Swiss-Prot record:
Transmembrane segments: none annotated. This is Putative regulatory protein CLL_A1210. Belongs to the RemA family. It comes from Clostridium botulinum (strain Eklund 17B / Type B). NCBIfam families: MtxBflmRegRemA, PRK04323.1.
Length: 89
């Protein structure tokens, strides 16, 4: 099984194997998840100061903020063209 990496915007790359969910930041429960992650020190802000459009939740309980739409991240996850690298273990 290889490690799949996906671009989440501005040159930031995340391991696709570790993703649990890609969601929109608009709802109150997601805003609470973001605040709780910030309080625990588990929040990664990859927006470069831009508006948060996608919230990525990983299996390690890290919460990653991205300025790319959730649909775009999901599309990059599902296509081979946007996979940055595959490494065989």
């Amino acid at each position: 099984m290889g490690i799949k990496l996906i671009n989440i915007g501005f040159g930031n790359i995340v391991s696709a194997n570790r993703l649990v969910a890609i969601v929109s930041p608009e709802s109150a429960p997601i805003k609470r998840i973001i605040q709780e992650a910030r309080d625990r020190g588990m929040l990664i802000d990859a927006t470069y100061g831009r508006r948060t459009r996608a919230v990525i939740i990983t299996d390690s309980d890290h919460v990653i903020l991205s300025a790319v739409q959730p649909e775009t991240v999901a599309h990059r996850l599902s296509t081979k063209d946007e996979v940055v690298d595959e490494v065989d273990e």
